[in-house]
Design a protein with these regions (language model features):
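A structural signal for multi-pass alpha-helical bundles of membrane permease subunits
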Residues: 3-6, 12-247
């Protein structure tokens, strides 16, 4: 009986891994086609199939796209757009994750009068379409003198991502035993000591989830990038769109 159960368990595990591998191959296939096609010259693309390997490592298309491809009226390549995305994404991700951790810590473990109402308003922000806030955000950026700038994009992404990061951390910290906090308070630990010495060390899983979530959301965003950027602050998503429409 135990041998039969072990065999069924091994079969189910093998089936699970095969299913996951097939799913991964399905989603990675477009990336593979994109990479191998970018390494082919025009004749290879016309004569060979999409999945065939290139005859040689030809990086001319990469150099052209990076240095001198035309994105509208400018022909400076995608490099400026890439660095704009880097300077925009890293601060926005780090600040929104840190701020969300503090919000989640307060709303789950240091509840106060009105904390549930405040969390409900933040939760509403998770489901609000970004198109609804384009005009108000544009007005606020104008008042702050941050229109068409990297700093303005950082602020927009920070505020847009804060409801989600708060939700992640609040739900994660809600599972922390209250006795642990009570014991720390009895030992004289205050708000910041509990957060830095107890909560932060146990937050690695949710921190990684939030960092990945925020990075992908901000790096891949097009709406805010095209609405709030200027000529010198457009992110890579806008640059790629301009490149595709130019060529």
């Amino acid at each position: 009986m135990s041998t039969k159960f072990l065999s069924m368990h091994m079969f189910s595990r093998a089936l699970l891994y095969v299913t996951l591998l097939v799913g991964a191959a399905f989603f990675l296939a477009p990336l593979y086609v994109m990479v191998v096609t970018s390494l082919k010259d025009a004749d290879e693309i016309r004569q060979n199939s999409l999945v065939s390997l290139p005859g040689g490592m030809n990086f001319d298309a990469w150099r052209l796209a990076w240095d001198s491809a035309c994105t509208g009226a400018q022909c400076s390549g995608l490099e400026p757009f890439f660095w704009n995305s880097v300077w925009m994404t890293i601060p926005a991700v780090l600040i929104s994750t840190t701020w969300g951790a503090l919000n989640g810590y307060v709303l789950s473990l240091w509840k106060f009068r009105g904390s549930e109402t405040l969390f409900a308003f933040l939760l509403f922000g998770v489901f609000m379409p970004f198109q609804v806030v384009l005009l108000p955000m544009s007005q606020v950026l104008g008042w702050l003198g941050m229109s068409s700038s990297i700093a303005g994009l950082i602020l927009v992404h920070l505020l847009a991502g804060l409801p989600s990061t708060t939700l992640f951390f609040r739900n994660y910290y809600a599972a922390v035993p209250k006795d642990l906090l009570n014991a720390a308070r009895m030992d004289g630990a205050g708000f910041w000591m509990i957060f830095l010495r107890i909560i932060v060390p146990m937050s690695t899983p949710i921190v990684m989830v939030t960092l990945i979530w925020q990075f992908t959301q901000i790096w891949n965003d097009f709406l805010f990038g095209v609405a709030f950027s200027g000529a010198d602050s457009k992110p890579i998503t806008v640059g790629l769109n301009n490149l595709a429409n130019t060529t």
